[in-house]
From Swiss-Prot:
Catalytic activity: a flavonol + UDP-alpha-D-glucose = a flavonol 3-O-beta-D-glucoside + UDP + H(+)
Binding site for UDP-alpha-D-glucose: A356, Q358, H373, W376, N377, S378, E381, E397, Q398
Record's keyword annotation contains Transferase: yes
UniProt GO molecular function: flavonol 3-O-glucosyltransferase activity; quercetin 3-O-glucosyltransferase activity; UDP-glucosyltransferase activity
Name of the featured protein: UDP-glycosyltransferase 73B5
Induction context: Induced by pathogen infection, H(2)O(2) and salicylic acid.
Length: 484
């Protein structure tokens, strides 16, 4: 498209303050910057530190492109939050008995930034505001100042369609128990789920009322940006545009906007392993022989569950890289590991505490499977890397994403999770071992691997010039230009 015209576009990107929301929004800001727009990320002081290094590196590599940060004040203590509570990951590691209440308080406190947002919009007069779904108040701010507001959910078309049809048809009200399976009505394909898995927010709860606000603000917004590509879930992209949100652009996989090795390594928090050391370890392994396990930035397993995973991995006989997050009450020691586990798996297993350079690892030829919690960032990163997956959903919309991976795309093997992780049901070592064996070398492993590889190729083609996501970015930018 015309480079001079596109340079006039200035887009504000306002992510919810949590790693899983910030990472794809940073990718998106870089993507639009590469396509000639000026990108400005809006965030708070502590979160700005997470953005600074990757943005600085991006600017050094692309000196002609425009991308920056605007910091909003967020006085935690004044807002009734603990000191330093500027990110939802703080709450996940906080792990006090009232952490659920703290999350809600954090969610509602973000409205404190509304006035700062409006002042900044008035001053800069941007072409558009891309704001996270968790900022429903942003629609009103943007509308008041004549700026189109785009919603970013950070999930798949498929899960958005599932959520919509669950709300419209309420099939969970027509079954005997919360664990009774039913088909979600009105969707392409027979998608079977239970109320426990669908994780429907009760409408009368504070979270239920908040989600109603989210939906209303979405209805009044300019449209929706989705981190997916058309070929992956075309039937659901079409359904979404026909029945849910008339205006939606697919612009993913966003993780593919990280092209350089350093960009992939620096994505998110500072990794707890040197990337060169990690790559050297992977280089020593046979292609497709290593299983990678990571459960997102919001999952903390109990010591009992960590022990079962360890036994399951050892029993599978597979080489592995395992990213382990624990909350502050569990300490840094590894007493949860089976006795002698480290010695028995020396050279075969790598345990990374906290944060790992995930995209860098997934892209390595030694990786043959990905054990994931089915958060959409991880799922789409696994798809873009062309990998089959072991699905272990924990909460949020993750059971929907699992259905997409296992039933629609057929590149996933279910570990056996049937309800939200907070209910405390353990996945046994036998289940872990069976799923890991199946994804790497089971009866249908080759067929699954070939199809996953094909999807990975389609993902990469989607973001190249002429691809479906590349073209949708064009359409979106042309629409913004047309408003001038």
């Amino acid at each position: 498209m015309n480079r001079e015209v596109s340079e006039r576009i200035h887009i504000l990107f306002f992510p919810f303050m949590a790693q899983g929301h910030m990472i794809p929004i940073l990718d998106m800001a870089k993507l639009f910057s590469r396509r000639g727009a000026k990108s400005t990320l809006l965030t708070t002081p502590i979160n700005a530190k997470i953005f600074e290094k990757p943005i600085e590196a991006f600017k050094n590599q692309n000196p002609d492109l425009e991308i920056g940060i605007k910091i909003f004040n967020f006085p935690c203590v004044e807002l009734g939050l603990p000191e330093g509570c500027e990110n939802a990951d703080f709450i996940n590691s906080y792990q006090k008995s009232d952490s659920g209440d703290l999350f809600l308080k954090f969610l509602f406190s973000t409205k404190y930034m509304k006035q700062q947002l409006e002042s900044f919009i008035e001053t800069t007069k941007p072409s558009a505001l891309v704001a996270d779904m968790f900022f429903p108040w942003a629609t009103e701010s943007a509308e008041k100042l004549g700026v189109p507001r785009l919603v970013f959910h950070g999930t798949s078309f498929f899960s958005l369609c599932c959520s919509y049809n669950m709300r419209i048809h309420k099939p969970h009200k027509k079954v005997a128990t919360s664990s009774t399976p039913f088909v979600i009505p009105g969707l392409p394909g027979d998608i079977v789920i239970t109320e426990d898995q669908a994780n429907v927010a009760k409408e009368e709860t504070p979270m239920g009322k908040f989600m109603k606000e989210v939906r209303e603000s979405e209805t009044n917004s300019f449209g929706v940006l989705v981190n997916s590509f058309y070929e992956l879930e075309s039937a659901y992209a079409d359904f979404y545009r026909s029945f849910v949100a008339k205006r939606a652009w697919h612009i993913g996989p966003l993780s593919l906007s990280n092209r350089e090795l350093g960009e992939k390594a620096r994505r998110g928090k500072k990794a707890n392993i040197d990337e060169q050391e990690c790559l050297k370890w992977l280089d020593s392994k046979t292609p497709g022989s290593v299983v990678y396990l990571s459960f997102g930035s919001g999952t903390n397993f109990t010591n009992d569950q960590l022990l079962e995973i360890a036994f399951g991995l050892e029993g599978s006989g597979q080489s592995f890289i395992w990213v382990v997050r624990k909350n502050e009450n569990q300490g840094d020691n590894e007493e949860w590991l089976p006795e002698g586990f480290k010695e028995r798996t020396t050279g075969k297993g790598l345990i990374i505490p906290g944060w790992a350079p995930q995209v860098l690892i997934l892209d390595h030829k030694a990786i043959g499977g990905f054990v994931t919690h089915c958060g959409w960032n991880s799922a789409i990163e696994g798809i873009a890397a062309g990998l089959p997956m072991v699905t272990w959903p924990m909460g949020a919309e993750q059971f929907y994403n699992e259905k997409l991976l296992t039933k629609v795309l057929r590149i996933g093997v279910n570990v056996g999770a049937t309800e939200l992780v907070k209910k405390g049901k353990l996945i046994s070592r036998a289940q872990v071992e069976k799923a890991v064996r199946e994804v790497i070398g089971g009866e249908k492993a080759e067929e699954r691997r070939l199809w996953a590889k094909k999807l990975g190729e389609m993902a990469k083609a989607a973001v190249e010039e002429g691809g479906s996501s590349y073209n949708d970015v064009n359409k979106f930018m042309e629409e913004l230009n047309g408003r001038k």
